[in-house]
Swiss-Prot record:
Its EC number is 6.3.5.-. The keyword Ligase applies. The lineage of its organism: Bacteria, Pseudomonadati, Pseudomonadota, Alphaproteobacteria, Rickettsiales. InterPro entries: Asn/Gln-tRNA_amidoTrfase_suB/E, Asn/Gln-tRNA_Trfase_suB/E_cat, Asn/Gln_amidotransferase, Asn/Gln_tRNA_amidoTrase-B-like, GatB, GatB_C_1, GatB_Yqey_C_2, Gln-tRNA_amidoTrfase_suB_CS. Pfam families: GatB_N, GatB_Yqey. PROSITE patterns: GATB. This is Aspartyl/glutamyl-tRNA(Asn/Gln) amidotransferase subunit B. HAMAP family: GatB (MF_00121).
């Protein structure tokens, strides 16, 4: 359990999340308008999106299927009967004057997702519901000192709002949940999870309490746009509430906004209750009826999910749970790994993948899909190390050339003359030279200064251009020095 340290003792975090995930679909939830990101403002707006009189919404079947698949992946109940409601409020980028959502009868309920806690234990986070709704447009305030502008390209794009129970007990758990959910959505293809583009947004409901006490008054932090900011926003808001209570104040139920630059939250408005939105069934849309046949068909076509892959990697490839989770977190990395792991030692591959390759990808700010090294060539590099053709040190040089050029490792080794020296006669000759050239060091070593052993190894590596087999060098050198 993670606690907040106050002046009067420890306080507990109580956190629930609302994730707004834009559905991966070529058209909007209730119209045929395109959903292409960053198009010219107001170029993807139909009469339905603009709320022109007499225009009726038509439900996008693909969006419904995406929601069902997501619900199945979350081990949730798919409701065969659900209803679209009007959520009434006025805002400039909501031309209808209401948002079409699902309040009373959502499409998905009662799901779960397990996350790994800081102690290494698995914790189940309950998911209250997943419902379908349409996104609002976008208000732009920084283009003019006198006017605000409205872009309706986003208006009507399908959203899945995924709401957890208040089961999350630390900022790190919240971040872990969002990371795992994002990975899951990407695997099934229902959302690309790009928080920078706003296709996945997070609201956090936060309250604090003493251990064993009832739930406190919560505040909602809106539109947190990165994993890092989830942690920062929750930490700040929880500490703000603790300081307020300890100084004799009262937490007001309100909606707040996190400022990433200052690291603080500020009040936007008092928190609304459901009654304020005057929900009622949308008269333009029939209830959504889902058949068992459709649910079973979508379930049968689900891809292998992250938790299933983790179990497979541990069982088939002998990976640790941690390594398996690191690889599985990104579907494209998992696909790359599987292609290479069938041709080489998977454990050694994992070490190189998570250290050398990830390091170079981060340095170049690219994803694995843009990597010039093919899975097959990566496997060849691992095999060259395994069969002692090259040393680990030389392999790093070869890897860097591969990353820049995409060349096969065996070609690079051949062109650069980097084959590891593993011939006993050749190595003994070099060792004899080093011993002859350093009589004082030999005498000191034999007198008990064993740290000099690494000096001799370094001299041998220098003479062989780093190509000497290090294991063989250690063995032969010890024999020569009589140790």
């Amino acid at each position: 359990m993670t606690y907040i340290k106050g002046n009067t003792g420890k306080w507990e975090y109580v956190i629930g999340l609302e994730i707004h995930a834009q559905i991966s679909s070529k058209s909007k939830l209730f119209s045929g308008s395109s959903t292409t990101f960053a198009a010219m403002p107001n170029s993807q707006v139909s009469y339905v999106d603009a709320a022109m009189p007499g225009m009726l919404p038509v439900l996008n079947k693909h969006c419904v299927h995406q929601a069902i698949k997501t619900g199945l992946a979350l081990k949730a109940q798919i409701n065969k009967y659900s209803v679209f409601d009007r959520k009434n409020y006025f805002y400039a980028d909501l031309p209808q004057g209401y948002q079409i959502s699902q309040f009373y009868y959502p499409i998905v309920q009662n799901g779960t997702m397990k996350i790994l806690t800081s102690t290494g234990d698995l914790k189940t986070i309950r998911i209250n519901r997943l419902h379908l709704e349409q996104d609002a447009g976008k208000s732009i305030h920084d283009q003019s000192p006198h006017y605000s502008f409205i872009d309706l390209n986003r208006a009507g794009i399908g959203l899945m709002e995924i709401v957890t129970e208040p089961d999350i007990s630390s900022p790190e758990e919240a971040a872990e949940f969002v990371k795992k959910l994002r990975s899951l959505l990407r695997y099934i293809g229902s959302c690309d999870g790009d928080m920078e583009k706003g296709s996945m947004r997070c609201d956090a409901n936060i309250s604090v309490r003493r251990s064993g006490e009832p739930l406190g008054i919560r505040c909602e932090i809106k539109n947190i746009n990165s994993i890092r900011n989830i942690i920062k926003a929750i930490e700040f808001e929880a500490k703000r509430q603790v300081d307020l209570i300890e100084s004799g104040g009262i937490v007001i139920q309100e909606t707040r906004l996190f400022n990433a630059d200052s690291g603080e939250t500020r009040t936007i408005r008092l928190k609304e209750e459901a009654i304020d939105y005057r929900y009622f069934p949308d008269p333009d849309l029939l209830p959504l009826i889902i058949s068992d046949e459709l649910i079973n068909k979508l379930k049968a076509n689900l891809p292998e999910l992250p938790d299933q892959k983790i179990e497979k990697y541990m069982k088939e490839f002998g990976l640790s749970k941690y390594d398996a989770e690191v690889i599985v977190a990104d579907e494209s990395v998992a696909e790359y790994f599987e292609q290479a792991a069938n041709e080489c030692n998977p454990k050694m591959l994992t070490n190189w993948l998570t250290s050398e390759l990830f390091g170079q990808l981060n340095k170049a700010s690219i994803g694995i899909s843009k990597c010039k090294i093919t899975p097959s060539n990566f496997a060849k590099l691992i095999k060259l190390i395994e069969n002692d053709t090259i040393s680990g040190k030389i392999a790093k040089t070869v890897f860097e050339i591969m990353f820049e050029t995409g060349k096969a490792p065996d070609k690079i080794v051949e062109e650069k003359g980097l084959v590891q020296v593993s011939d006993n006669n050749v190595l003994n000759t070099v060792i004899d030279e080093v011993i002859t050239e350093n009589p004082k060091s030999v005498e000191d070593y034999r007198s008990g200064k064993e740290k000099l052993f690494s000096f001799f190894v370094g001299q041998i590596m220098k003479k062989t251009g780093g190509k000497a087999n290090p294991i063989l060098v250690n063995q032969l050198l010890k024999e020569k020095l009589g140790s």
